[in-house]
Amino acid sequence: GVVLDLRNNPGGLLDQAIKVSDAFLNRGEIVSTRSRKVDDAQRFNAKKGDLAEKLPIIVLINGGSASASEIVAGALQDHRRAIILGTQSFGKGSVQTIIPLSGHGAIRLTTAHYYTPSGRSIQAKGITPDIEVKQAKLETIEQGRLRREADLRGALKNPNAPKKKGAEGDKSSDKEGAKAKEKPFDYQLDRALGLIRGISLYNARVSN
């Protein structure tokens, strides 16, 4: 399967969003731009050919996914080509045009809006994920130093135990805990990979 991570992707050029969407679609509309004038509407369609060859696709989005990344997510979602996982996207669906002014100035105007294949406007709404998964922050629970037999008052000492064994053991445990804290854990990505494995396993059993 394929996991397409569009989280914190602020977007880019429209033609690149169309190419990325087209890579996973065989046919149909990818996105349309509509302005006040009906005649100025533009529609962009996919060409035949699926890069993933019907493999399951998960698209990750969050509040930092905007503009071109929302076009990709919206197109794959409307065509039911991918499952969108994460949180609501940013909602930047406006087409802005720079118009030169006399002299050395220019003005940027919003001239149209982006619409997904099903006719949804992205502007100020964004893409709603099929499966909402918020990023979880996992932390190690600090339990302090655990009490052992050797910590009890009047406990018998081990005659064969090296000196300061307990202190060295504590330092070792502290180092292991520090290493565990350093390892980042991406909960949303982990959920996406688990979902990909589940879908792939199911499809394999059905085909057999």
Predicted ranges, named:
Residues 1-208:
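C-terminal "post-core" interaction segments
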